[in-house]
């Protein structure tokens, strides 16, 4: 069952990384990296439904990826993996709202994470749809304007709007300006 979920796995041990990717592959598209720096770059490049991160990485703590992940991907499910039950680490994980799991973990654990990520994504999509419908009515938005808002809500980079809608970039710019004028909201910029 492929649900189209996107997972970011940040784990420095290649064998564990492969195991996690294998366990997540039946639920979506896992991307795996081995360092904090690579994790930050991956988070900047796209949005994810779930982050599975090791605590001890060669260039820092995986815990330092939680805040940037939540900022870039609101509603992201975070699972922190650790080889030892250090009280201070577990405390930090729980304070961040993430889950933790002691290594080793198996495919059954990955299914639980995938199910939670899918549930959160579906809830987020329902809220977005309700908001878009309300805005369409309140601001008398055209179908094109609703589509622009929808692309923004999906996390599509503004530069890619013209490609997705198959129009010129200056057309997108004008449509966004009209949308901003109608709504009086500059958060779309």
Model-derived regions: residue spans:
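Acidic, metal-coordinating helix/loop segments flanking the phosphotransfer/catalytic sites
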Residues: 32-50
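Alpha4 helix (beta4-alpha4-beta5 surface) of REC/receiver domains from two-component response regulators
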Residues: 64, 85-101, 108
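Active-site residues of response regulator receiver
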Residues: 54-55, 82
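C-terminal output helix
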Residues: 88, 105-114, 164
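Two-component/phosphorelay signaling modules centered on CheY-like receiver
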Residues: 2, 13-32
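Recognition helix of helix-turn-helix DNA-binding domains
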Residues: 155-189
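Short amphipathic alpha-helix used as the core "switch/output" element in two-component signaling
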Residues: 41, 63-75, 92-95
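Regulatory hinge/linker segments at domain boundaries
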Residues: 119-151
């Amino acid at each position: 069952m492929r649900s189209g979920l996107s997972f970011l796995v940040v784990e420095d041990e290649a064998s564990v990384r492969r195991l996690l990717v294998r366990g997540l592959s039946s639920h979506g598209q896992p991307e795996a990296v081995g360092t904090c720096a690579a994790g930050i770059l991956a988070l900047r490049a796209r949005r994810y439904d779930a982050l599975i991160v090791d605590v001890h990485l060669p260039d820092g703590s995986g815990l330092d990826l939680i805040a940037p992940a939540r900022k870039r991907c609101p509603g992201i499910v975070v699972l922190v993996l650790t080889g030892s039950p250090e009280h201070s680490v577990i405390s930090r994980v729980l304070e961040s709202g993430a889950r933790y799991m002691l290594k080793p973990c198996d495919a059954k654990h990955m299914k639980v994470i995938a199910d939670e990520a899918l549930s959160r994504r579906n809830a987020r999509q329902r809220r977005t749809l309700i908001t878009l419908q309300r805005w369409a009515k309140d601001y008398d938005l055209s179908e094109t304007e609703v589509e622009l808002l929808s692309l923004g809500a999906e996390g599509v980079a503004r530069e890619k709007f013209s490609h997705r809608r198959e129009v010129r970039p200056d057309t997108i710019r004008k449509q966004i300006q009209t949308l901003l004028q109608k709504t009086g909201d500059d958060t779309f910029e």
